[in-house]
């Protein structure tokens, strides 16, 4: 499984570590991902999603059904 949020589509970014002497080396900024189990009332089933902290806030704000529909329209859900 790749490190992509299934709700927001967030994925890892690439940047630089900058030392005191300003020498730059490449690094990866990973997304704050975790697996979370939700009860989907409209479908009467449990859903396990791999979401970021921002995705969890979005679900709390607009609801699970609306968030899943939005993610499906944008193509973030693979199932």
Curated annotation (Swiss-Prot):
GO terms for cellular component: ribonucleoprotein complex; ribosome. One of its GO terms (molecular function) is structural constituent of ribosome. InterPro entries: Ribosomal_bL28 (IPR026569), Ribosomal_bL28/bL31-like_sf (IPR034704), Ribosomal_bL28_bact-type (IPR001383), Ribosomal_bL28_sf (IPR037147). The keyword RNA-binding does not apply. GO terms for biological process: translation. Keywords: Ribonucleoprotein, Ribosomal protein. It comes from the Bacteria. Belongs to the bacterial ribosomal protein bL28 family. This is Large ribosomal subunit protein bL28.
């Amino acid at each position: 499984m790749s490190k992509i949020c299934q709700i927001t589509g967030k994925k890892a970014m690439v940047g630089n570590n900058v030392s005191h002497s300003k020498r730059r080396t490449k690094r990866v900024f990973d997304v704050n991902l975790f697996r979370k189990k939700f009860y989907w009332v409209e479908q009467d089933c449990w859903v396990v999603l791999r979401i970021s902290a921002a995705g969890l806030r979005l679900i709390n704000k607009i609801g699970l059904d609306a968030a899943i529909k939005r993610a499906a329209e944008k193509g973030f859900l693979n199932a």
